[in-house]
Design a protein with these regions (language model features):
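S-adenosyl-L-methionine
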Residues: 38-78
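A short, Lys/Arg-enriched amphipathic alpha-helix followed by its capping loop at the start of a domain
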Residues: 17-23, 42
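Extreme N-terminal starter segment of soluble prokaryotic enzymes
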Residues: 1-5
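Short beta->alpha hinge that forms the Motif I/post-I loop of the SAM-binding pocket
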Residues: 30-34
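C-terminal target-recognition/interaction regions appended to catalytic cores
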Residues: 253-438
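Class I SAM-dependent methyltransferase "Motif I" SAM/SAH-binding loop
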Residues: 8-9
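Class I S-adenosyl-L-methionine
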Residues: 70-84, 94-336
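Glycine-rich SAM-binding Motif I of class I
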Residues: 12, 16
């Protein structure tokens, strides 16, 4: 049985993929108490019991040592009066907020330094193989005066991969060139590019990156993933009359328990939908499949749009623009509305988008407020987002469903747990490459 450690484990996307590939997770760690509840609950479902055959440690990685990890593994019941095994793989995705191209980037963000702590733990545990996963922005993040684990001071402007490869080489690990993998190429119904960095202890067989398992023309679509979760029964029967194989796999389960059998979903969890006002619902109605907020605004101004069946929007625009309701309808029905007038109708937000049903989803993020369901004028449930990430339906996300404001800095509610996760099927594809050479 190959053994793995999952650091920065989050809700457990990587762990799901590793277990599907055949690994046993002996130790995992994350800093979030919200994540801990979800992660432990799932592992109990799978027969991975705290203190018996696995250990989760809620900890800042800066406080986590190889000695602590070895101690917890040695105390597991399965190793009673036995030597603890060599660790085959450490996998981890250091917090990526400072690297991300999806939002603001801050070179001084202390979270950018966590990959150095990851290298430290690798050096203290000495696994056979290592995998680091992160956002694409990881590869071109520059550091100023970075001092490595071995005391090397790197020139200002040195990029992360250069530092990482040098640091790993200094502690006895060779590395492959980092590669961008798209989750959609590995059976995930989502366009999600992630940088994967693989390393191996010097003298061992080098791993390879996985080749795509799905051709571009055969990528799974949003309809394949969540068509059976349409809430309107008549619409669901018309659009998704028969479950797809992906839907069946999600329902029946992919991740095996310690007994080797996946867990079918007895009931669907995480299906609660956000409450929406009439104005928001009517705005969502205006979007065509695949259309962004900026393109909708352009269409309103250059072509016109019929809002005669949108009473809440008519009233809003009438009051704000000081026009009679019939004049509001006429204003937007034909070309010529100004940008300011269009923004009263639509708001100034340009990032909203109605996802297209016949394509993989866009990248699932931690805030789902601006993504619109293709068949119903609403945002997505946590379960729908989890389906797009390739989580089993039996995987239940616990804790608060969402959060806001300054609490986003420390809380990891359900939507964030899903959006931060590595898609299990992507993690599985990479982990299988390690299994091949062990």
């Amino acid at each position: 049985m190959p053994y793995a450690i999952d650091l920065f484990c989050g809700a457990g996307g990587c762990s799901e993929g590793l277990i599907q590939a055949g690994f046993h997770i002996l130790f995992s760690s994350d800093i979030s108490d919200m994540v801990e509840v979800t992660y432990k609950h799932r592992h109990e479902q799978l027969g991975l019991i705290q203190g018996k055959n696995t250990w989760f440690e809620r900890s800042d990685i800066r406080d986590l040592t190889g000695e602590t990890i070895r101690k917890h593994i040695a105390e597991l019941e399965i190793f009673k009066q036995k030597d603890i095994p060599e660790i085959d793989l450490i996998i981890g995705g250091p917090s990526c907020q400072g690297f991300s191209r999806a939002g603001r980037r801050d070179k001084s963000d202390p979270r950018n330094m966590l990959f150095g702590e990851y290298v430290r733990v690798i050096n203290e545990i000495r696994p056979k193989y290592i995998i680091l996963e992160n956002v694409e922005g990881f590869v071109d993040m520059q550091f100023m005066g970075y001092v490595g684990l071995t005391g090397i001071t790197y020139p200002d402007g040195t990029v992360t991969p250069t530092i990482l490869r040098s640091e790993l080489n200094e502690i006895g690990y060779d590395t492959l060139e980092p590669r961008v993998l798209n989750a959609a190429d590995f059976g995930v119904p989502q366009r999600r590019n992630r940088i994967i960095f693989m390393g191996y202890r010097k003298g061992l067989t080098p791993p390879e990156y996985p080749e795509p398992t799905v051709k571009p023309e055969n990528r799974l679509t949003l309809l394949d993933a969540i068509g059976d979760l349409i809430t309107d029964p008549l619409k669901r029967a018309s659009i998704n009359p028969h479950p797809t194989q992906y839907q069946l796999d999600s329902i029946n389960g992919r991740t095996p328990t310690v007994d080797g059998n996946p867990i079918p979903a007895k009931k669907l969890t995480n299906t609660e939908l956000p409450k929406q006002t009439d104005i928001v619902r009517e705005r969502f109605d205006l979007f065509l499949p695949g259309e962004s907020g900026s393109n909708l605004k352009k269409r309103v101004m250059e072509i016109g749009i019929d809002i005669s069946d949108k009473p809440a929007l008519i009233e809003l625009c009438s009051n704000t623009l000081n026009l009679q309701p019939e004049d509001v309808i006429t204003l937007f029905k034909y070309p010529g509305a100004t940008k300011e007038q269009a923004e009263v109708l639509l708001t100034k937000k340009n990032i909203r988008q109605r996802w297209a049903p016949n394509q993989p989803s866009a990248t699932v993020v931690t805030i789902a407020d601006d993504y619109i369901n293709p068949w119903e004028s609403r945002t997505f449930s946590v379960r729908e987002m989890a389906r797009c990430q390739s989580f089993d339906d039996s995987f239940e996300f616990l804790g608060k469903r969402t959060t806001g404001g300054l609490l986003r800095r420390k809380e990891v509610p359900q939507y964030s747990q899903v959006g931060n996760a590595v898609p299990p099927l992507l993690a599985k594809a990479v982990a299988l490459e390690i299994i091949k050479i062990l």
